[in-house]
A protein has these predicted regions:
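Non-catalytic accessory regions of SAM-dependent methyltransferases
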Residues: 1-125, 149, 175-186
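Non-catalytic substrate-recognition/targeting regions of SAM-dependent transferases
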Residues: 111-116, 120-122, 140-195
Length: 195
């Protein structure tokens, strides 16, 4: 399947005095922590992140327009491609099914909490509602929606990326159907036996 954007398109090297947070597993790399960017990667692309001494820390997606310049996705030396995103989504969906097997309306993906910074996916009975809060997730929208719908066994998807935080990523607010329109008034939410 491969990455819709490409593999590592660059290397972000951190300042020696500013790499401890990323090495400790924090998913955000601020612009002030970066020493250099090699390879001229486009914003939104997957980059390798290295310590000040040059050792591998992880991989994430870059956005120079944001104060959070890199959002780390993994601290393993593994490719971050469409299959990687599919596995991470599958892990999140399985976890929800494990802790709340009867839930038909719940948060399936909660951004950094599920290792997918900038992505929120909620299920409302037969519909998935997406928020793409960062450029790195927004440009992968098609594969994230398609994979999520396949995993959930659903067809209906709606986007609610109408939040102000997108402006910090250089993105416009978005709201609307993802795919064929559907009658949202037919969706009835049930929780603990109540509708």
């Amino acid at each position: 399947m491969g990455d819709a954007i490409g593999g590592d398109s660059g290397v972000v090297k951190l300042k020696p005095s500013r790499d401890a947070r990323a090495r400790a597993g924090h998913p955000w790399v601020y612009e002030g922590e970066i020493s250099s960017v090699r390879g001229n990667p486009p914003d939104g692309s997957i980059v390798a992140v290295c310590s000040g001494s040059g050792s591998f820390i992880g991989r994430g997606y870059l956005n120079r327009a944001s104060q959070i310049a890199v959002r780390l996705l993994t601290w393993k030396d593994e490719p971050v491609d469409n299959e990687w995103f599919a596995r991470r989504l599958q892990d999140a969906f399985r976890y929800r099914d494990l802790v709340a097997p009867e839930a038909r309306s719940c948060r399936l993906v909660h951004s950094e909490g599920d290792g997918l910074p900038g992505l929120i996916v909620d299920r409302y009975e037969g519909c998935l509602v997406f928020q793409f809060l960062t450029l790195g997730m927004d440009i992968r929208k098609d594969v994230l929606v398609r994979t999520s719908l396949e995993l959930a066994g659903l067809k209906a998807a709606y986007e609610r990326s109408d939040v102000r935080s997108r402006q910090y990523e250089g993105l416009e607010q978005q709201r609307g159907f993802l795919g064929a329109p559907f009658d949202a008034s037919s969706i009835q939410i049930r929780e603990n036996g109540f509708a």
